[in-house]
Each structure stands twice: as structure tokens, then as C-alpha cells.
């Protein structure tokens, strides 16, 4: 496959044009008065959104050189979204400004390597300053303000604060589509999984068609149980110990005589047991069973660890305060597992989340984490049309991510003002000289861009606003929604510091790489082959 090359200034200018095309598309959405972007979809209705990363993912530029620049900025938005879940538009605007300012200096003869050093030092100093000025949040009202600002909707803010309050900061909040118009909150306490009873005869509450077990024993078996001979020794021990105590059996499957024996005993009233299938498949099933075991103080019975069902005693059984089993779901509330073991398991899952590259794996691990940490909240969202529903769901997901980030590292004043104040630490160019000092100055000039575009989108003169904000004290800034200057934290205009910090760090990372680029290599487009049968040889028919 032949390649075509572009060198030096030409190469960098082409990259910059690509960066600008993508950033100009995204930056119309920034701020409370930002606009939306409509994205055509091959199938179904178009998507209307103001989410930077969603827009960035859809942009492909025709010119292959420019497309390289656009793809690099897409990386900024995606990475910021992965780390902080929001702030993707801010990151894109910063990347564009850093590239523009940096390339001016490279064209004027500055050394790209020294510029990069200056930019890196400046970003580190600004990040440190942002973290130092961040205010931790634990008040419900603060959480509501962060979420409301991200989703641009007060009701959403209050709902997310309510959900956070219920599940704690490690709990999972998921967003589902509903058939009604408004927003609803559903809370499931304890560990729930999507498998119900294997036979309707297990039901204890006929009206609600559910089996409720108070203070039960819990048996977790990795394989299938089909022969009653395997189960009988343990059942006898349970009945001897406490005949009135119910038993929940979680296994890959329970069939044949093993199931029928349990059902017969239940109907006769001699013994109350409920059997459910284990959730998930393969390795994920093993991991989920182990989670349940840790939560309830049970031991997973499997051949792998040398445990056989017909040889174990009561010590392998776990307990919980209450278990509710419906046709489709099982919920374990207040498992009797040891606190430190549960914490250890939570830490292990958190480490796995940090190390995974797959979004799907990360989502599944988050779910497991929440189930261990004590609950799941589902926010159900509805809308009049499919297009509006997608847009609302997206805004909700962003707001949840922003709120998590805020709880983790704290908040700074929003509306782009935190960066304007934070770059004041760069005033002496950090004692750098020459091209490194120029690199520091590049960051100083670029950092005002998010505020500038928030103002421009509100129909105002951007640079006038940025210089006014720079003269104010820390925490003060411009509120584009009301058009007033003042204490932004009090006004509820706040950003999670993690979002602002990640946006700047990721933008600088890509921009400084782009400045040090000298050559572009792209594949040559192959000429279209003429369609077969296109040559006429003049045969008369």
C-alpha cells in the first residue's frame, strides 16, 4: 500500500486545520447558552446533543492529513470522558487554543521540545493550584448543584443528589428508559441479581408472588445439583441445627429429583427452601458467586477448591437478615459477611476497574462494586420522542459522572473562571527562560479560552469578560446564565476539580505531541477500478 507524506510547517498546518474543524463543531455547545449539534445517523432518527465527546466521535474529516488532527483531538475528549465523565467540550477548546498558540511559536522558530517542557511544567503547576483551592463536598445541596449545572436542569440535580444520598459514593446509579414522561427514582437495597425462583411452589407470599426468607442459611454451589443424594447430608444437618430456619440455594442449576424433593418438602411444610440459578456466565459468574460469598459469609462450593457438596457442613453456609426472591430477581439484604473481607473485596474490584481498558468490563465491575457497597439506584427517564429521550438520557449520564468526580476530589468555581484564576501562578513564567518560558505563556493564554467561549455563546465579547474575571478574586467569576459577576460557588455555578484538571492535562498532552510533529504519513487512496464490463470492444450483437 503506497503512502503519501507531508513535512514540516505544511504538516503542522494540516493538523491544525483538522483540530480547528473538530473544535469549532464542538465549542458551540459550551456554557449555559451553548447550542446543540444535530448528528445524522445511518439508521433511525438523528441525534441531537450538546455533549462534546458524542459530537467528537462522529466527526471524520475528508482530507486525510486534517483527519489526523481531528482524531487527535477526539482522543482528548474521549480520555477526559473516561477519567472524569464530563468536561469534554472544555478539553477540546483548551486543546485547540494550546495548538494554535504553540504552532505560532514553532513557526516563529521556537524549539518544540523546549515548548513542550514549558507546557508540561505549567500544566503541573496549574493542576496543583486547582487541587489546593478545591473545596470538598458532602452537603446534599452541593451535590445537587453540580448535577444541575452539568445537566442544565434543577430537577435532575435534586434527583441525583437523592440517589447519591441513598447509595453512597461507591453505589451505582444507572439510567433506564421508561414509558412515562417524567423522571422517577427506584432504589434497591442490598445485593440484587436478575435470577428468580426455579419453581413457583417456593413462593411464601401468594399475593405478591414472592418468597421472603428471614434470617436464612445461604448455600452457594458453583456446579449443577441434580441428585438428591448430593444435597441430603447438608439438608439433614440444617434441619438438625434449626428446622425453622429457611435455606436459599444458589447453583448453576437445580434439576430433577433435587428440585422436586425441595418442592415436596416445601408444600408439606416440613422444610422451607428456595432455589435460584446463579447469575452471569463463565468467569463473571464465578466472580459474582464469590462476591455473594464474601457478602454473606458463605464459602463457594466447587470442585476447583476441593469441596464436594455431599461432604460439607454448616460452616460453608452464609446468612443474611432477609432475602426476597421474585419470579425474575433475588435481593440479599444485610449479608452477615465480615466487614473487613467485604472492604478487601471492594478494594480488589476498584483495582480491576482502574486496570481495565474495556468499557463493557468497566461497567460490569462498577455494577459488582455497587452491589457489594450497598445498593443500586435506577433513574427512569421518559420523553415525548425518541430523539428527546436519547438526549435526556445522555445529559443524565453526564451529570452522574460529574457528580461522582465532584465527590472524589472536590469542587472549584465553574464557568471557566477556575482556570483563569489558577493560571495566576504562572505569572513569573515559573522562573523559566527562553522557549520554556514561552511554553508557560502558551498555557497562560490558552486557559482563558473556555470562559471566552462561554461568554461568546452568550452573545458577549469574550476577551472583555476574561480580562474582567482575571481582575476578580479567586472564587469570583462571570455567571453566563444571569449575565452577572459574583461569587460563583454561592450561586451554584461549580465544576468538579477533577473535570477541570483532566480537561487541561489531556488537552496539553495531545497539544504538546502535536507541536513536536514533523512528518505525516497517510495511505494513498486507491483509484477506483472501473466497473467490470465497462470496456466496449465494439462487438455487435
Swiss-Prot record:
Keyword Glycoprotein: no
GO molecular function, one term: ATP-dependent protein folding chaperone
PANTHER family associated with the record: 60 KDA HEAT SHOCK PROTEIN, MITOCHONDRIAL
Catalytic reaction annotation: ATP + H2O + a folded polypeptide = ADP + phosphate + an unfolded polypeptide
Compartment list: Cytoplasm
UniProt main location, coarse: cytoplasm
Function: Together with its co-chaperonin GroES, plays an essential role in assisting protein folding. The GroEL-GroES system forms a nano-cage that allows encapsulation of the non-native substrate proteins and provides a physical environment optimized to promote and accelerate protein folding.
Classification of source organism: Bacteria, Bacillati, Actinomycetota, Actinomycetes, Kitasatosporales
Record-annotated disulphide pairs: none
Subunit comment: Forms a cylinder of 14 subunits composed of two heptameric rings stacked back-to-back. Interacts with the co-chaperonin GroES.
GO terms for biological process, alphabetical: chaperone cofactor-dependent protein refolding; protein refolding; response to heat
Family to which this protein belongs: Belongs to the chaperonin (HSP60) family.
Name the record gives this protein: Chaperonin GroEL 1
Alphabetically ordered keywords of this record: ATP-binding, Chaperone, Cytoplasm, Isomerase, Nucleotide-binding
One GO cellular component term noted in the UniProt record for this chain: GroEL-GroES complex
HAMAP family: CH60
Enzyme Commission code(s) on record: 5.6.1.7
Record: residues binding ATP: 29-32, 86-90, 415, 479-481, 495
InterPro entries: Chaperonin_Cpn60_CS, Cpn60/GroEL, Cpn60/GroEL/TCP-1, GroEL-like_apical_dom_sf, GROEL-like_equatorial_sf, TCP-1-like_intermed_sf
One protein family per Pfam: Cpn60_TCP1
Amino acid at each position: 500500500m503506497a503512502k503519501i507524506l507531508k513535512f514540516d510547517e505544511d504538516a503542522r498546518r494540516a493538523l491544525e486545520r483538522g483540530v480547528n474543524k473538530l473544535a469549532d463543531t464542538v465549542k458551540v455547545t459550551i456554557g449555559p447558552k451553548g447550542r446543540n449539534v444535530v448528528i445524522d445517523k445511518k439508521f433511525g432518527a438523528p441525534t441531537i446533543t450538546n455533549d462534546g465527546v458524542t459530537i467528537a466521535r462522529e466527526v471524520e474529516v475528508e482530507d486525510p492529513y486534517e483527519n489526523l488532527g481531528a482524531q487527535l483531538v477526539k482522543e482528548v475528549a474521549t480520555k477526559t470522558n473516561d477519567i472524569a465523565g464530563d468536561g469534554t467540550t472544555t478539553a477540546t477548546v483548551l486543546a485547540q487554543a494550546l495548538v494554535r498558540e504553540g504552532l505560532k511559536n514553532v513557526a516563529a522558530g521556537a524549539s518544540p521540545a523546549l515548548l513542550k517542557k514549558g507546557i508540561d511544567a505549567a500544566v503541573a503547576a496549574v493542576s496543583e493550584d486547582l487541587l489546593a483551592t478545591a473545596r470538598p463536598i458532602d452537603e446534599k445541596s452541593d451535590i445537587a448543584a453540580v448535577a444541575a449545572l452539568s445537566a442544565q436542569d434543577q430537577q435532575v440535580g435534586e434527583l441525583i443528589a437523592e440517589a447519591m444520598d441513598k447509595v453512597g459514593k461507591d453505589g451505582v446509579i444507572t439510567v433506564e428508559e421508561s414509558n412515562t414522561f417524567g423522571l422517577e427514582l427506584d432504589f434497591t437495597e442490598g445485593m440484587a441479581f436478575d435470577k428468580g425462583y426455579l419453581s413457583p411452589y417456593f413462593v411464601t407470599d401468594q399475593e405478591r408472588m414472592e418468597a421472603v426468607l428471614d434470617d436464612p442459611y445461604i448455600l452457594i454451589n458453583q456446579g449443577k445439583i441434580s441428585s438428591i443424594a448430593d444435597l441430603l447430608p447438608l439438608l439433614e444437618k440444617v434441619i438438625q441445627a434449626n428446622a425453622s430456619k429457611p435455606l436459599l440455594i444458589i447453583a448453576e442449576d437445580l434439576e430433577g429429583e433435587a428440585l422436586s424433593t425441595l418442592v415436596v418438602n416445601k408444600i408439606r411444610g416440613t422444610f422451607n427452601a428456595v432455589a435460584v440459578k446463579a447469575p452471569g456466565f463463565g468467569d463473571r459468574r464465578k466472580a459474582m458467586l464469590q462476591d455473594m460469598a464474601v457478602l454473606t459469609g458463605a464459602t463457594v462450593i466447587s470442585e476447583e477448591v476441593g469441596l464436594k457438596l455431599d461432604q460439607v457442613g454448616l460452616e460453608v453456609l452464609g446468612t443474611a437478615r432477609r432475602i426476597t426472591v421474585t419470579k425474575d430477581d433475588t435481593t440479599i439484604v444485610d449479608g452477615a459477611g465480615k466487614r473487613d473481607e467485604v472492604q478487601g473485596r471492594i478494594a480488589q474490584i476498584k483495582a480491576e476497574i482502574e486496570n481495565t481498558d474495556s468499557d463493557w468490563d468497566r461497567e460490569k465491575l462498577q455494577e459488582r462494586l455497587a452491589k457489594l457497597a450497598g445498593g443500586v439506584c435506577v433513574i427512569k427517564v421518559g420523553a415525548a420522542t425518541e430523539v428527546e429521550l436519547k438526549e435526556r438520557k445522555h445529559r443524565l449520564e453526564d451529570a452522574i459522572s460529574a457528580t461522582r468526580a465532584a465527590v472524589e476530589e472536590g469542587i472549584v468555581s465553574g464557568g471557566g473562571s477556575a482556570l483563569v484564576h489558577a493560571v495566576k501562578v504562572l505569572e513569573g513564567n515559573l522562573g523559566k527562560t527562553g522557549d520554556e518560558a514561552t511554553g508557560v505563556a502558551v498555557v497562560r493564554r490558552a486557559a482563558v479560552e473556555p470562559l471566552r467561549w462561554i461568554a461568546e455563546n452568550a452573545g458577549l465579547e469574550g476577551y472583555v469578560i476574561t480580562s474582567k474575571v482575571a481582575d476578580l478574586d479567586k472564587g469570583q467569576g462571570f455567571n453566563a446564565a444571569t449575565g452577572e459577576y459574583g461569587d460563583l460557588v454561592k450561586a451554584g455555578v461549580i465544576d468538579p476539580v477533577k473535570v477541570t484538571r483532566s480537561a487541561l492535562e489531556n488537552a496539553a498532552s495531545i497539544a504538546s505531541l502535536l507541536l513536536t510533529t514533523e512528518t505525516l504519513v497517510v495511505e494513498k487512496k486507491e483509484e477506483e477500478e472501473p466497473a467490470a464490463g465497462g470496456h466496449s470492444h465494439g462487438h455487435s450483437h
